[in-house]
Amino acid sequence: MLEELKEKVYYANMELMEKGVVLYTWGNASEMDRNTGYVVIKPSGIAYESMRAEDMVIVDLNGNIIEGKWKPSSDTATHLELYKAFPEIGGITHTHSTYATALAQAGSSIPAIGTTHADYFYGEIPCTRSLTEEEVEGAYEKNTGLVIAETFAEKRDMILHTPGVLVKNHGPFTWGKDVAESVYHAVVLERIANMYCITSFMQKNTDMPAYILKKHYLRKHGEHAYYGQT
């Protein structure tokens, strides 16, 4: 079932390791097939080096295993809440990449202060609030997804224009139209976080004019985008 999608999700997860944003068994990526309502996701605790496409797990939106010999990622419920909250999202990635996670631990959002940021994220990359003790002791992973959705509640139309978030005390989640795009955004987010940390060390108070942010984002993603060969 969904053999091509399992291959796609497998290779997307492997790219996380190849790009250096995950170690050991850290991180996970998934994609939802909106036709069946099923999600293909990395198995829990399986080392990337030994993982194969057939190890990917298929679950429904209630978290029931539809196909697979392993348990799905421990973060599955977070992915599912995001798929339910935002139908535009087709793929999700979670990592513990160094700089993005450091900022999440600090509770720091990432303001748009440079054009690299503006090329991919239209505005600040937000950091969520901390989960309450009740949220952590209850359905922790589900509540993580709900807190992310809460963070975008008043700007849900920006969900694909700001395709990532830092979960306070935890780490980054990114998304896109499919799993490949969500992985791409995870790699880019880590580089942006790196640049922001270095810039903040050099210059505490810096910003970027809104017109530069708008120009760089829209030349790549706007109605009249002209970046690339399309």
PLM feature spans:
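Glycine-rich flexible loops
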Residues: M1-T230
